[in-house]
UniProtKB/Swiss-Prot annotation:
Single GO term (MF): alpha-tubulin binding
GO cellular component: cytoplasm; cytoskeleton
Superkingdom as given in the UniProt entry: Eukaryota
Phosphoserine: residues carrying this PTM: 18, 41
Spans of repeat LRR: 73-98, 99-123, 124-147, 150-172, 173-197, 199-224, 226-250
One Pfam family linked to the record: Ubiquitin_2
Organism ancestry: Eukaryota, Metazoa, Chordata, Craniata, Vertebrata
Residue ranges occupied by any LRRCT domain in the UniProt entry: 262-303
Protein name: Tubulin-specific chaperone cofactor E-like protein
Summary of the function given for this chain in its UniProt record: Acts as a regulator of tubulin stability.
InterPro entries named among the record's database cross-references: LRR_dom_sf, TBCEL_Ubl, Ubiquitin-like_dom, Ubiquitin-like_domsf
Keywords: Coiled coil, Cytoplasm, Cytoskeleton, Leucine-rich repeat, Phosphoprotein, Repeat
UniProt keyword Phosphoprotein present: yes
Length: 424
């Protein structure tokens, strides 16, 4: 069979990790010995190959000499071949079959939809535990073939593949724990439920940017579909109903949820969104990446009760009654005006005179002196001011900085200001 034109995996490997481009690391086992090669071979006698090889965006179209791959890559455990020009699964198989320790393989953004994956080729992937096929447009038939030949696969990435439906294989994959299938076109729950059938041991499901419009499944059926699901991301889905959020309680092991950017929550403030979701999901310990503390949960549940306290009984969610049983009926919080005071009524003391007056707190000490000039008959340059807080245990505080704003003293109604002359 003729080797495809273009750059080979082996050629790129030698170029990138040659001693000239990748300084030799001294120490036992750091270098890889390569047997003598034909004259004119681009390989050096020793290369410094790490166990993680990153060969993305290198224009790779084919494998190259398999014996050389085996000699160089016996210890390699992670391989990134994303954004190359690999379109033949047979060439990918030549590479992978000669990397016996391989556990992580990234084939994203290679046009692998242009060829059919045969079972003999798929078998070379058998040791891989983490497989990335983002933007490869891999068909479900290809995915099924891979799943059958990867008994230890734990993580699978199928993002940006334009899936509108999900096809179930005849045999489910019990080993898979994490599935990223973001940025596809999976809008119907009937397609999402197939993932539960296909991957019964699934721990983490990332469905972001799929515009899922609803979770249409009886509660008991949801528990059977995803019995081990601990984390789900519905970021930028199309959910529009609180009933869909309540459905998440049917996943028996669910602890972590991501729900940013969904139509349902758009009308609410940031505080309302988080508190209302936390209150509806009693088992969730992490929301949108942030831990839900015991204190935050109690605050959210109390907020939830007050939020629905005036809603007609027929419209109150079931969770409201559960929380009433827990906390009892709560009165609405009193509205407290926390805006800073703009003025204060104070007593101005000068010699034996006491004058009650209102002063603006947004003015400075210098401006207050001008206001007092007529009252105390002193030039501002000869005026000393002292502020006395009637509730403070300390004595008067000199107001000696002319540019200091009065509100910074914490002046309140009933406080006193003493005026003295510098020259008595």
């Amino acid at each position: 069979m003729d080797q495809p034109s273009g750059r080979s995996f082996m050629q790129v490997l030698c170029e990138k990790y040659s001693p000239e481009n990748f300084p030799y690391r001294r120490g036992p086992g750091m270098g890889v010995h390569v047997p003598a090669t034909p004259q004119g071979s681009p390989m050096k006698d020793r290369l410094n190959l790490p166990s993680v090889l990153v060969l993305n965006s290198c224009g790779i179209t084919c494998a190259g000499d398999e014996k050389e791959i085996a000699a160089f890559c016996a210890h390699v455990s992670e391989l990134d071949l994303s954004d190359n020009k690999l379109e033949d699964w047979h060439e990918v198989s030549k590479i992978v079959s000669n990397v016996p320790q391989l556990e992580f393989l990234n084939l994203s953004s290679n046009p692998l939809n242009l060829s059919v994956l045969e079972r003999t080729c798929a078998g070379s992937f058998s040791g891989v535990r983490k497989l990335v096929l983002n933007n490869s447009k891999a068909s479900w038939e290809t995915v099924h073939m891979i799943l059958q030949e990867l008994p230890d696969l734990e993580e699978l990435f199928l993002c940006l593949n334009d899936y509108e439906t999900v096809s179930c294989p005849s045999i489910c994959c019990h080993s898979l724990k994490l599935l990223h299938i973001t940025d596809n076109n999976l809008q119907d729950w009937t397609e999402i439920r197939k993932l539960g059938v296909m991957f019964p041991s699934l721990d983490t499901l990332v469905l972001a940017n799929n515009h899922l419009n609803a979770i249409e499944e009886p509660d008991d059926s949801l528990a059977r579909l995803f019995p081990n699901l601990r984390s789900i991301s519905l970021h930028k889905s199309g959910l529009q109903s609180w009933e869909d959020i309540d459905k998440l309680n049917s996943f028996p092991k669910l602890e972590e949820v991501r729900l940013l950017g969904i139509p349902l929550l758009q009308p609410y403030t940031t505080e309302e969104r988080r508190k209302l979701v936390i209150a509806r999901l009693p088992s969730v310990s992490k929301l949108n990446g942030s831990v839900v503390t015991d204190g935050e949960r109690e605050d959210s549940e109390r907020f939830f009760i007050r939020y629905y306290v005036d809603v007609p009984q027929e419209e109150v969610p079931f969770r409201y009654h559960e929380l009433i049983t827990k906390y009892g009926k709560l009165e609405p919080l009193a509205e407290v005006d926390l805006r800073p005071q703009s003025s204060a009524k104070v007593e101005v003391h000068f010699n034996d005179q006491v004058e009650e007056m209102s002063i603006r707190l947004d003015q400075t000490v210098a401006e207050l002196k001008k206001q007092l000039k007529t009252l105390v008959q002193l030039p501002t340059s000869n005026m000393l001011l002292y502020y006395f807080d009637h509730e403070a245990p300390f004595g008067p505080e000199e107001m000696k900085y002319s540019s200091r704003a009065l509100h910074s003293f914490g002046i309140r109604d009933g406080d006193k200001i003493y005026v003295e002359s510098k020259t008595k």
